[in-house]
UniProtKB/Swiss-Prot annotation:
NCBIfam families: rnpA. One of its GO terms (molecular function) is tRNA binding. It comes from Desulfatibacillum aliphaticivorans. Consists of a catalytic RNA component (M1 or rnpB) and a protein subunit. This is Ribonuclease P protein component. Its EC number is 3.1.26.5.
């Protein structure tokens, strides 16, 4: 079984990383999230989370970010190849419960996994 850690190397942290991913990446979406993804430059998958102020107050935005990061931490092994992913929250996700968000992320990551095969 793989590691369930979420280290700094597995995060998109700098603006140029997000911009580069936006330029070279593919997009998939569902009712609550948009994912921009591209094959990773390194050997590990990396996650970025974008939740704008349109989604809700700070408490709501932080809850959504925690939910996305936790889902990635537990399910990163399901990605077939190393992928850089930026998950963008839509306004519709602000009033949903965590299990529904996890199901939505599951659907999204399945589509990312299918689209990331080389």
């Amino acid at each position: 079984m793989g590691s369930f850690s979420y280290t700094k190397e597995q995060r998109l942290r700098k603006r140029p990383q997000f911009l580069a991913l936006g330029e070279r990446g593919k997009r998939v979406q569902n009712a609550y999230f948009i994912a921009v993804f591209a094959p990773a430059q390194g050997k590990v998958s990396r996650l970025g989370v974008t939740v704008t102020k349109k989604v809700g107050d700070a408490v709501t935005r932080n809850r959504i970010k925690r939910c996305v990061r936790e889902y990635f931490r537990l399910n990163q092994h399901r990605l077939k190849a190393p992928v850089d992913i930026n998950v963008i929250a839509k306004k519709a996700c602000c009033q949903q419960e965590s299990p529904l968000l996890a199901a939505s992320l599951d659907h999204l990551f399945n589509r990312v996994s299918e689209g990331s095969r080389h």
